[in-house]
A protein has these predicted regions:
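Phenylalanine-focused residue identity feature
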Residues: 6, 23, 29, 36, ...
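PAPS-dependent sulfotransferase catalytic core
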Residues: 1-75
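PAPS-dependent sulfotransferase catalytic domain
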Residues: 82-152
Length: 152
């Protein structure tokens, strides 16, 4: 069975938004921008690098299961391209991602930090998402993250 949700796991200040807009032009896709952001903001204590967090929390669902349900419902009608931030995935072993096609987008760290520091001074590895992206990569590469038939 073809996986119908394509989940781009990126960090801020990458080309992820441009990539999302390119998928939005394809008639077979519906595009969702950072669907787990509301859930993430509800869970983290330091929101200093999220200047519009109150507005985002009012506008977006806080419940991870509701977000997953919405994406899977959309996937019944069309292919789904979800532009997600790696650090918005707060679980150690996000098994729900195993049913989706996941793409990890990584920008050269030096360029990423330089770009991000123009917006947020002294960015941390957590804020730029690179640490979480690596953790997700490790999860996908472990036996519990691998699924029979998905790998050689």
């Amino acid at each position: 069975m073809m996986k119908r949700i394509f989940n781009l796991l990126s960090g801020p200040r990458n080309i992820s938004t441009a990539l999302m807009y390119s998928f939005a032009q394809h008639p077979d896709f519906v595009v969702v921008d950072e669907p787990f952001y509301g859930h993430y903001l509800r869970q983290v204590s330091d929101r200093s690098s999220h200047p519009m967090d109150e507005e985002i929390q009012k506008a977006m669902p806080h419940n991870k299961d509701q977000v997953i349900e919405r994406l899977e419902k959309l996937a019944q009608e069309k292919l789904v391209f979800s532009k997600s931030m790696a650090h918005h995935c707060i679980e150690e072993e996000p098994r729900y991602l195993l049913d989706w096609t996941n793409i990890i987008l990584i920008r050269h760290p030096k360029k990423l930090i330089h770009s991000f520091s123009k917006v947020i001074p002294d960015p941390t590895l957590e804020a730029i998402g690179i640490k979480k992206a690596f953790g997700l990569y490790q999860f996908f590469e472990t036996p519990q993250g691998a699924r029979t038939g998905d790998r050689e």
